[in-house]
Amino acid sequence: MSAACGCDEPTTSPADEADEAERPWWRDPGLVVPILSGVAFGTGLALEWSGLHIAALVAFWAGLLLGAYTFVPGAIRNLVVKRKLGIALLMTISAVGAVILGYVEEAAALAFLYSIAEALEDKAMDRARGGLRALLKLVPETATVLRDGTSASVPAREIAVGDVLLVRPGERVATDGLVRSGRSSLDTSAITGESIPVEVAPGEAVSAGAINSAGVLEVEATAAGTDNSLTTIVELVEQAQAEKGDRARIADRIARPLVPGVMVLAVLVGVLGSLLGDPETWITRALVVLVAASPCALAIAVPVTVVSAIGAATKFGVVIKSGAAFERLGGIRHLAVDKTGTLTRNRPEVTAIVAAHGFDDAQVLAWAAAVEQHSTHPLAAAIAAAGRGTPAAQDVAEEAGHGIGGLVDGRRVAVGSPRWIDAGPLKARVEDLEAEGQTCVLVTVDGFLAGAIGVRDELRPEVPEVVRTLRDQGVEVSMLTGDNSRTAAALAKLAGIGDVYAELRPEDKARIVAGFSETSPTAMIGDGINDAPALAGATVGIAMGATGSDAAIESADVAFTGHDLGLIPQALRHARRGGRIINQNIVLSLAIITVLLPLAITGVLGLAAVVLVHEVAEVVVIANGLRAARARKQ
């Protein structure tokens, strides 16, 4: 909520909000008290119409006190303790002034309408955070842990790294881990937005919140029950809801000075009007001005939309880290895409081994696999998986964009691209493999060329359609890769991408993306260590979250929990729609003030009428903002 509201900021956690949201409305004092205020006010109107004026006055006072209870204490506390002038203070002054002038009925109307509008605003924000609460509910309350040969049910929050979990069919995985025994398929649709079940076997990773669809699994926890991938997503979304974008800051820049400005204007109207006319009339109009020009709707215009949109994005597998990133995402006109693991299926396989003279294929593969098992690069995983009986490697160091090296059985082994290691007598064979669309790495042992390994990673089937959709959205697509130009060109042709940059180091990618960003808003999407500098330098950095490296995820503004590149145009559509709703809300909020202010000064509308129009406008703005939560994976 905007600071301009002058209301107490909520301090509850998402878990607390989840509990509060599940309470029936009649047990929520934030809603019951305004309703009782309305009942008392309505009763007062009925009694007054019946001619029972004293009873009506009592009912109006009851409605006034009940409604005022919801905002007056907070307004005074903010003024005295925090030295903040808020909208609630304007309403308090108006209500007190109306009572002093003898307009108890109008004061009761103000208290009721403002309190019910604030209650609806709080409920709207709770609803907007519904996606976050849904994520929290994906983790089961208890989990079965195997200890000393027996199983025991323990609270999920007490799970520690190294615990072995027994996950039966139909149960959710309580925290991140590795399958120790068993095979099954997992439903991860609630986390990643992908409907196709994921097959898992021993040694493969599973995520918190996934549903075990088939066999019994034993899973060794790699994260504590309170610190896993789901809690990380929740923390990111919490931060996103707190951080403001340009339009949110514009709304605040207007709303904050508007509150004291309104107070000054009201004083001027009251003083100058009293000098020129009837003091009671002009003081009454001054009180109406306090309400007419208060930026209630403006204060909530952006937050409710951003919170709704960011929460909705998590439902289809997109985690947006800040309100600023959400707003920038809607303006993207250029997309730079990493090739390996992003455009490709991320299931590379070793397709060729060429040993140099004096070495054999098995030796070359074993040496390469020994060091590559320490790398996060998708191609490294293919080489590590292909090597059987892999020896241990020590003193391993990875140089992003070049390769990796280490000691294997006392020998210095290096694995890297042909740009880092000279192919020598294997150059012609390496070029042939690259022309076939394979990516080649070279292996040296103690400085001598041992061989070359060809790896192929197929293009994701959805890529051509995604590229066409992005073009239809007015987004230009460029491919960036550290791979050789021949392999890159072959894959780009299949993808329908005409703008290709190959044989790039991490610093080259960062430089190119920075150049793109200078001419048009640019997003960069990738998932590896070598993508991190480019992600950080883009207008919006997007990380493929499920398999991405920590460096890439930390550098990005947006993370995909799944692998479907169709999320890119969906995320852009979602952000653009949210941006349009934000603009609509800001324009509507300012229009209400512009229209009501002269009507208040000239006395056309009284206090009750202005309050009614103002609060109805706020409800309209809230309802419009909640439209941003209507997102579906397409």
How would you describe each model-predicted region?
Residues 134-227, 324-368, 407-408, 519:
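Conserved cytosolic catalytic loops of P-type ATPases
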Residues 38-39, 249-277, 285-294, 303, ...:
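Bilayer-spanning, highly hydrophobic alpha-helical transmembrane segments
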Residues 3, 10-25, 44-45, 60-142, ...:
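Actuator/coupling domain of P-type ATPases
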Residues 81, 92, 127-132, 141, ...:
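Conserved catalytic phosphorylation-site environment of P-type ATPases
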Residues 349-476, 485, 494-513:
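P-type ATPase nucleotide-binding
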Residues 46-47, 74-80, 93-101, 312, ...:
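Membrane-embedded alpha-helical bundles of multi-pass transporters
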Residues 61-64, 115, 257, 283-301, ...:
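Small-residue-enriched core segments of transmembrane alpha-helices in multipass membrane transport
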Residues 410, 439-584, 622:
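Conserved ATP-binding TGD loop and adjacent catalytic N/P-domain core of P-type ATPases
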